[in-house]
Regions:
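Classical nucleotidyltransferase
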Residues: 101-214
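Positively charged, low-complexity intrinsically disordered leader regions
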Residues: 1-21
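General small-molecule cofactor/ligand-binding pocket signal
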Residues: 2-4, 93-96, 153-157
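Core alpha/beta nucleotide-donor-binding catalytic domains of modification enzymes
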Residues: 36-119, 126
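Phosphate/ribose-recognition catalytic cores of enzymes acting on nucleotide-derived substrates
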Residues: 150, 204-301
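Short, glycine-rich nucleotide/cofactor-binding loops
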Residues: 24-36
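Conserved beta-strand elements of the Class I
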Residues: 21-23, 54
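Residue-level signal for inorganic ion chemistry
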Residues: 32, 85, 124, 187, ...
Length: 301
């Protein structure tokens, strides 16, 4: 997958050639099963039309600019989102910088600048409830109104239902709700994978060693979505170049919360991972923590 960081025709041609594109647009936070269903349709339609498949997304969640006080926590960081998008087989992702100026752009201008001028759009595939542009004024009908005079088609898709039969469509909001309740399995059912967090091990207070359970204090970006406080069964991969262990994955017990034994009044959740069968020093190493099951809530011991 090519990553394009400028919404210009020159940048797009350099990445995927002078060809037309079938496009989908969105925040794509989590790259969940609903997103993957849309991208599969984009790829299929692009192949049928002899075009390239492209995801148009943003360098930050639009809500973090438009309404920062209520912006959702993210299911994926920027790097993980690109990795997951690449795994769908899409030809390219255009990452549009999102700032106050972008937030104020009229939907018609966005379509002309990004889709028509930069991407030479041949088709647009989005959810039937898709909105975009200034004050979310753009929608499927606006795309259809513009399509006739600009030679592209619009194919709206319905929401993807959950595989477990629950009457709730797959969405980033539903996944965040599941995580907030500690239901990492329900989140995984909608993500199509287990939820994960990445971070660097900080110094912590090392008091866990005094009670026989040395833990790694993983510093996770504050913008990311943490599951509910509690203890989880997890798998932890050491991503950094620690000798003899880089790339190795361990079973782990992960505690999310205020560490009630030592920090009853902590102001924010902390992530501590105890890697089974690992006794080395993890300080300053980058870890990937994958949540498999909720074990119990926090309790002081």
């Amino acid at each position: 997958m090519k990553v394009v960081s400028q919404a210009t025709r020159e940048a797009v041609v350099a990445a995927i050639g002078d060809t037309r594109s079938v496009v989908t647009i969105g925040a794509y936070d989590g790259v969940h099963l609903g997103h993957r269903a849309v991208i599969a349709q984009v790829r299929a339609r692009a192949a049928a039309l002899g075009a390239r498949s492209v995801v148009v997304t943003f360098d930050r969640h639009p809500a973090s600019v438009v309404r920062p006080e209520s912006a959702p926590k993210l299911l994926t960081d920027a790097q993980q989102k690109l990795e997951l998008l690449a795994s769908t087989g899409v030809d390219a992702t255009l990452v549009v910088p999102f700032n106050a100026e972008q937030a104020g752009e009229a939907p018609v201008d966005f379509v002309q600048r990004v889709l028509v001028d930069a991407l030479a759009v041949r088709g647009v595939i989005v959810g039937e409830d898709f909105h975009f542009g200034y004050k979310r004024g753009g929608n499927v009908q606006l795309l259809r109104d513009m399509a006739g005079t600009r030679d592209f088609e619009v194919l709206p898709l319905g929401l993807v239902a959950r595989a477990d039969g629950v009457d709730e469509p797959v969405s980033s909001t539903a996944i965040r709700r599941a995580l907030a309740g500690g239901d990492v399995q329900r989140a995984a059912d909608m993500l199509g994978r287990h939820h994960e967090l990445r971070g660097v091990v900080g110094p912590g207070d090392q008091r866990g060693r005094t009670i026989g359970f040395p833990t790694a204090n993983v510093e996770v970006d504050a913008s990311l979505c943490l599951p509910a406080d509690g203890v989880y069964a997890a798998r932890v991969t050491i991503e950094s170049s620690i000798e003899g262990a880089a790339g190795t994955t361990y079973d782990a017990a992960v505690n999310l919360g205020r560490r009630p034994t030592f920090h009853e009044h902590a102001e924010h959740s902390l992530l501590e991972a105890h890697l089974l069968d690992f006794a080395g020093d993890l300080y300053d190493q980058r870890l990937r923590v994958v949540f498999h099951a909720f074990l119990r809530g926090e309790r002081k011991f």
